[in-house]
Regions:
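Sigma70-family region 2
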Residues: 31-32, 55, 60, 69-86, ...
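Arg/Lys-rich amphipathic alpha helix in sigma70-family domain 2
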Residues: 76-83, 93-113, 132, 184, ...
Length: 200
């Protein structure tokens, strides 16, 4: 019998494998100075990097500057990619270093409303939008209350969609530590939201 879920899982795996091959090929071309490959790489990874950086900085203009710095670092360092991690986790690790360099001495903030307004989605009515904004404000406030390490980890796993292994590679810590920190972050976030009468 033909299981559609099994086939869709196989297709998703094949797509991910094809994407990884495409990314490695793009990096090879970028290392040779191919501007079209760099543009394709930016289209593929720019929004994910922007979302991750925005989660940490909370400032759209600053986040866009950091994305530009990150892509410049990719342009200059494409030949240094050794394939020990996924391309996505490699570029996010670069963005993480760029963000850390830019934020030295600055307070971290959460996602800004301008970023949220730019996100695609359905067009709910004004009442639903008002409730969604209120709930979102509660979650944003709760995330702001987390330790920076927890905010960053939540951003990597849920914001950027990295696997636990990829997040571990980016953070340069064992997968077990990622799991325990993620559990602690979820617990802390739930605690903060429960204190405010919300839950995840």
């Amino acid at each position: 019998m033909n299981d559609p879920h099994r086939n869709s899982g196989a297709a998703a795996f094949a797509d991910r494998r094809d994407s990884a091959c495409d990314d490695a090929e793009l990096l090879r071309r970028i290392s040779k100075g191919d501007e079209d490959a760099m543009a394709a790489f930016y289209r593929e990874h720019g929004n994910v990097v922007l979302a991750q950086v925005l989660l940490v900085t909370g400032e759209r203009v600053l986040a866009e500057e950091i994305v530009q710095d990150t892509m410049l670092a990719v342009w200059r360092g494409a030949a240094s990619f050794r394939g020990e991690s996924s391309v996505r986790s490699w570029v996010i690790a670069i963005a993480r270093r760029q963000t850390r360099d830019r934020l030295r001495g600055r307070a971290l903030r959460v996602v800004d409303d301008a970023f949220l307004a730019d996100q695609p989605g359905s067009n709910p009515g004004p009442e639903v939008m008002a409730l969604d904004r209120a709930e979102l404000a509660e979650v944003k406030g709760a995330i702001q209350g987390l330790a920076s390490a927890h905010r960053e980890l939540l951003g990597l796993v849920f914001g950027s969609g990295l696997s636990l292994r990829e997040a571990a590679d980016v953070l340069e810590i064992p997968v077990g530590t990622v799991k325990s920190r993620l559990s602690a972050a979820r617990t802390a976030l739930n605690r903060i939201l429960n204190e405010k009468g919300q839950d995840l």
